[in-house]
């Protein structure tokens, strides 16, 4: 068996990636989220595949087909709620994974980090298009509002929006193409994940100290396969509690009303995992400015390697930057809350303050904190 594992051209790749991979001996549970994201992706592809067997991407039957899946298909309700809540688990793992990367300075592995940002954009695009498919009120109006943002692009904006819509409003053509893209994107994401792993295995994993761990490596299997399996059990437990006991807690009640272009819901808002970006978008009165801020709220992650001023990699031994980091986390929670609130006083002011704080902490305060720590520790 050892010979096959090490010699066979295909199994050899798996061996070098998941079995004999040299891993730092001290990586904590924060390093579990990569494998958990892989699990989430597999769950989403499998449940999505079974949903696609029964779903029809036509405006007149889309809503009914989802109801049919829940009522008439064997375990259709389970597959549907696993898919809907699987997206939430996916984003929880994603945010924790990115947060870990920022805390421990993993962004210094630039190729891996940039690939991760591309993956984040791809997953967000997939989730947005998936939310449109049930063709409820929030599906329709969410699609209308978000795609309409592209009209802010000078000169080509309106033409671009009508091209994406396939007409003069969100209609049958839009739903059909969103279904097509929603189906294909997870497979593209899977390919990007392999590239992400390829780049990671060029440098090896980071570790909680941020120091070089070449002198102290252990094989991935059995140590981290067992450790990851514990994470898998915890995730599946939380996931199934969510799916079986509180399946609608993260959804919007408006989406149980079929899409009606003549009736606008009182508060149009996306799923909870987009609320922080939605709050940043809404906090700028200008349409184009809002769109740019929305894109920058994620794209700013690409600047993190350039904004790294400290002589140390991780925040483990850097209390000032640690404080900035946790203020940033609190700020993102505030933005998430604001994104779900109506556009009125005092929420507008809080949203604008939190949006300014978000960019200021990343671009100004964290780099300055790094320089101060260098001086304190006399690392210049």
UniProtKB/Swiss-Prot annotation:
Entry's cofactor comment: Binds 2 heme b groups non-covalently.
Coiled-coil intervals, chain numbering: none
Keywords associated with the record: Electron transport, Heme, Iron, Membrane, Metal-binding, Mitochondrion, Mitochondrion inner membrane, Respiratory chain, Transmembrane, Transmembrane helix, Transport, Ubiquinone
Residues the record lists as binding a ubiquinone: 201
Cofactors: heme b
InterPro entries: Cyt_b/b6_C, Cyt_b/b6_C_sf, Cyt_b/b6_N, Cytb/b6-like_sf, Cytochrome_b, Cytochrome_b_C_euk/bac, Cytochrome_b_N_euk/bac, Di-haem_cyt_TM
GO cellular component labels: mitochondrial inner membrane; respiratory chain complex III
Binding locations of heme b b566: 97, 196
Location of the protein in the cell: Mitochondrion inner membrane
Its membrane topology: Multi-pass membrane protein
Transmembrane region(s): 33-53, 77-98, 113-133, 178-198, 226-246, 288-308, 320-340, 347-367
Subunit field text: The cytochrome bc1 complex contains 11 subunits: 3 respiratory subunits (MT-CYB, CYC1 and UQCRFS1), 2 core proteins (UQCRC1 and UQCRC2) and 6 low-molecular weight proteins (UQCRH/QCR6, UQCRB/QCR7, UQCRQ/QCR8, UQCR10/QCR9, UQCR11/QCR10 and a cleavage product of UQCRFS1). This cytochrome bc1 complex then forms a dimer.
Miscellaneous: Heme 1 (or BL or b562) is low-potential and absorbs at about 562 nm, and heme 2 (or BH or b566) is high-potential and absorbs at about 566 nm.
UniProt similarity note: Belongs to the cytochrome b family.
Name of this chain's protein: Cytochrome b
Originating species: Chionomys roberti
